[in-house]
């Protein structure tokens, strides 16, 4: 089975939308990763561009959060690791997703997370694609610099990942406003609600990772996916030791960790200097 994304005729006649669609095909076709939905083919039929994806049976991460209310702490960490690994594969190819949200993460029947819909992905070495400063991302998860129309980088995806992790742990996004613009400005100006107040069993180490992911100052935010993954893996090990074991996707993620990492319990998580 496959999934086909077809551009509507009226959108296909819009040169900007058409370029965005073609860009998605080019960007995702470069990526091959177990946590990214694979592009099988792309082209145009009778003037209508299309992309053929692998079909992923399961549900979106958003649907999973809505169904369960919130996720287990260890499962939340595991999905964050898988998403970070997927984003890392994209960032290493100079591709920024720009719209990281749980609606764009599929959870397959085996419980694995797969990132999809690079519909507004942009290669870092392309120029002029956001010269008008438009905010293209979903504002519930939008990074402050993206909301302000500034340069968007891999760090912007990491901010969005932090918001997704917050939602997995609490069952809700951190900000609610009258409209999408109001929410975007809350990302620019307001501190996130206290994660541990919302969910007391979240450890200080995990809360510190979320804080650093969602730092508004780029200098305080994680610089790249490698540090994020390293810290999340260590937090998962600590959570495993504290709870006496994990289930579900956290078990699968633990099996992917280096043997040396699995032996180091408890593990120290690097805290940002400003905490």
Q: Where in the sequence are the language-model features?
A:
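Conserved ATP-binding/catalytic core of the eukaryotic-like protein kinase fold
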Residues: 1-190
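Phosphate/oxyanion-binding loops and surfaces in catalytic or ligand/nucleic-acid-binding neighborhoods
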Residues: 59, 168, 190, 216, ...
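An acidic site on a long C-lobe helix of protein kinase domains
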Residues: 79, 157, 202, 221-224
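Short proline-rich PxxP-based motifs
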Residues: 187-200
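Conserved C-terminal C-lobe helix
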Residues: 201-214
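Juxtacatalytic C-terminal regulatory tail of Ser/Thr protein kinases
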Residues: 208, 219-267
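Membrane-anchoring helices that localize proteins to membranes
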Residues: 270-275
